[in-house]
Amino acid sequence: MTYRIHYEVRGTLSFLSHLEIMRLWQRAMLRCHLPIAWSQGFNPRPKLSLGPARNVGVEGLSEYLDAEFSESVRAEEVMSKLNEVLPDGVKVLDLRELAPGSKMLEAVINEAMYKITFLQGLPEDAKEKIAAFLAAEQCLYLRQSPKGEKEIDLRSYVLGIEIVGDSMFLAVKTGSTGSLRVAEFLTVLGYWDIIKDIKIQRISLFVTEGAKRNTP
């Protein structure tokens, strides 16, 4: 049986990388002695699958993990045992059993919602800059990586932006085709210099099909 675990990552643990979060979950499963299923081969691993990678330093308020178990176990037991051993900053919110043959998280999640809060107040030019960004056909950005430089179109990933008070709500495409990094978006807006005064949270992940938008 497989459970889809809905959880959050807050505070200093948001600075853990995708790989470090996976290791955290592996250790938690072992510590609470749940009957997790293991892969076959020379280097067996717990059968766990995370949703789309979250950028380091970005809190995740609605994250997902698929966990396969070798025998039946009650949802209440899984949630209770995990929350007993997980460190402060990571918490299971709820979980549900998946039907056999369900697609993996990375294959179905295709939209993310971010909340970008300006702790010193929304810049006076924010609305003007957002309007210009949305009106543009392209917004090319040179992304640096260990493999070299790659030019990407940030505008093509953005589905919508809404300003509420001192916060921006940014809806973006995500999934196997990639996504933008919020730090890149803030850089092209000219806000990199005040990044330390900006709080970034990934508040939702969605499965979007046409006009329908559902949680995983």
Predicted features, each with a name:
Residues Y7-V9, A67-V73, I116-L122, L170-T174:
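Short beta-strand-to-loop capping motifs
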Residues S14-L19, S72, E76-E77, E124, ...:
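Ordered, soluble secondary-structure elements with a strong preference for glycine-centered loop motifs
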Residues A37-F69, A99:
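Short, charge-patterned binding micro-sites
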Residues L61-K115:
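Ordered, amphipathic secondary-structure segments that act as subunit-interaction surfaces
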Residues E77-L86, A126-A135, E184-L186:
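Short amphipathic alpha-helices in soluble, non-transmembrane regions
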